[in-house]
Every structure is written in C-alpha cells, then in structure tokens.
Amino acid sequence: MWGLCKNHFPSNKIQVQERNKALKPKKSGSEHKTKQLFPVFNCKKKEKGVMIRFAILRNANTSLLSARSICLFTQAPTYCHVRLNTLNKSITTKRNSLTESKRHVHDGKHFFTTPHQQQQTKLGEIEEGHSPNIKGEDLRSIGQAITHQRNKRRKQIWSAIFGGIFGVILGYSLIYRVIYLKEQSFLPLFPSSKIRKLSSRDLKKVDVNQVQKLSKLRVLEILSGHDMIKEQYGVPLLDKDGNSPTLNEFSMWCEDQDPCVTGIVMEPDDKRDSSHTWYRIPFVCKWRITHRPISIRGTIDDLLNRIGLETSDLFEIISPERVYGSFKYEYPLQGDSHALHLWFHGEIELDDDSLIVYNGKYHVDVKLQEIDLFRREKNGQLVQYVLYKNEAGDK
C-alpha cells in the first residue's frame, strides 16, 4: 500500500510549504469535500482512538486506484484499537465462562437439569398457564425418579465394596494359602458358643465310662459323710429296692477357654485318610465346617514374634490360681493349641421323691463342683438342698 501512495505525497520541505500556501487562501466546496475524503495528516487523540488525516494537492493527478488505497489505509485499525478489542474480548470470555460454570453447578435438588434450566421451565409453565396440579405431579415424578436413581447407585456401590472384600479374602485364603502355598486355611464365618458337645473325634480320646464310674464313687463318698444323709437315708446309701444307687443320666460337654467362631477349614486335596468328614472339590481343595477359638494372647504373641520380640520380654503374668484343675492345665485335645474344660453332669435317684444331681470337671481325675438334693416334701413342695459346693472351683 505504501508503494502505491508514496508518489503522491511531498518528499521535501519546499513542497510542503508550497502545498500549504496553495491551500490556505482558498476554501471551496470541492476542497471541503477533499478534506472529508482525505483529511490533513494530523494525529489527534480522542477518547475512542486516533484520527489520521491526509490531504492531496489540488493540481496533483491521483488515480482511482491510489485514492482507493489511501482510503483503505485510513480505515486500517491502529495498535490502540487492536489492543482495546483484545482486552474487551478477554473480559467478555471470562464473564461467559464464569456464567457457564455457575450454570453447570450440580446440587442435590438438580440431578437431571441445572438450576438455570429449571427456572426457565418454571417461567415457561407460568406463561403458558399450566395448572398447579399438573406441575405438582411432574415434580413428584421427578422426585421419585431421583430417589430411585440414588437408591440404585447406592446399592451398586455397596455391592462393589462387599464383592471386592469377599474376593480379596477368598483369593488370599483359597488361591494363595491353599493352592499356591499348599497350607491349611481357616475362613471365619460367624461367632459361636464356647460350650459345645464332644465330637466323635473327641470321644475317642476320652473314656466316658471311666469318668462315669469315678464321678459316682466321688459322689457316694461325699454323701456318706453328710449328716443329713446319715440321719434320713442311712449309710451305706441305698435306693428304694435296697440296692446300690445307679445313674439315671450322665452327659459330658466341653467349654473353650477363649471366644469361638464357626468357619470353614480348607486344605489341599491330597486324598489322605482323616477322622474328619471332608467335602472335596476335585483337584482343588477339601473343606469342612468347624469351630475354632480366638486366642487374644496367642495373636499378640504372633505379632511380637514377627518383629523379633516375645511376651516375656515385655511383661510376665503370674496368676496364683493357675494350679491343677484350672484352665491352663485342663484336658488338651490333640492337634489343638488351646485347653478345654471337660464338664460332666449326672443324676442318681434315691427314691420316688428324692433325686441327687451333681456336676463337675474332668482332668485325669474327677473334680466335683456341686451336689444337690431335690426332694418333694409332704406338703407337695419341691425343695433343693445344696449338700456340697466347691467354692474355690471355677464354675
């Protein structure tokens, strides 16, 4: 553009002075039009920008192409205009982004729509003249849909959490412990009672007939020395037929020292004979349901052993009641690392109205805890007489 216009502008000071003299005394309508089309080169700062004026000599021959180029040059934006337009665009963009971010904020009341859209919907319904009943039904249906969606999502989250926990536990117990390490694994299910019946495996290790005979002898020995029995029943103690009293009922059970849980024991499927009843998954593992105690002290010992310490390094508990007959020295089942109480209960009938009831514990020898006499008196009342009670024993 400068190449087209440079020949029509004065190149020295003399030409500029001659041009000014020629333009100063004469003012006509054509000159006024020339000033409007090509203003004098004079930069005046205004509030909104810079105005550039150009003037062409009166006698100069200006082609149409050159005049058009000069007009285009006068209409070109300046640096101030470009800078101002850039700032305005950036401010407008920031305002629009803030407005859009505020519109897209979600809360508990607007699940499927934004607050702005809901306001527009309400205004449109009011302008159209919808009845409040239809509006309430719509809101109620939307609320039910939101509640259903939240409940469904909550169920999915909890299902994923429990499924992940179950998968990790089962993978560690079965895949890692049993299949990879070829070890026994115990998977606890729910708490169980500390008192339970003796299993068939336990009964093989305990001579129940011997315990029954020993308990009867100990009971008769104690009753023979009791004053009430001597006075009212005589010594030796006999039944109504004049024979030695017999046991009407005798039972045994065991009690664990620690809290117990019921769970599943899993082992590698080695097809060995066992006294337990196993359920097999071919070529994978065998499993059965059993009860196991939770030894708190044993758990602490295991944790200390892993870091190279022992319980005796920190403290030592000396309990004076841990003597013969206590939990520490009770009958241990083979293969188990915990002690058990072996309890027994028996009944001896003296006559139709008198019954001897006793209970105690067994460990190598019988240790009686209590002997009671239940007798129906002449007035028809059933009375319990405590003939013997071991105060020092743990019941």
UniProtKB/Swiss-Prot annotation:
GO cellular component: mitochondrial membrane
Membrane topology designation: Single-pass membrane protein
Segments traversing the membrane: 156-176
Endpoints of the signal sequence: none
Subcellular location: Mitochondrion membrane
Main subcellular location of this protein, as a coarse class: mitochondrion
Entry keywords, A to Z: Membrane, Mitochondrion, Transit peptide, Transmembrane, Transmembrane helix
Family to which this protein belongs: Belongs to the AIM39 family.
Protein name: Altered inheritance of mitochondria protein 39, mitochondrial
Name of the gene this protein is made from: AIM39
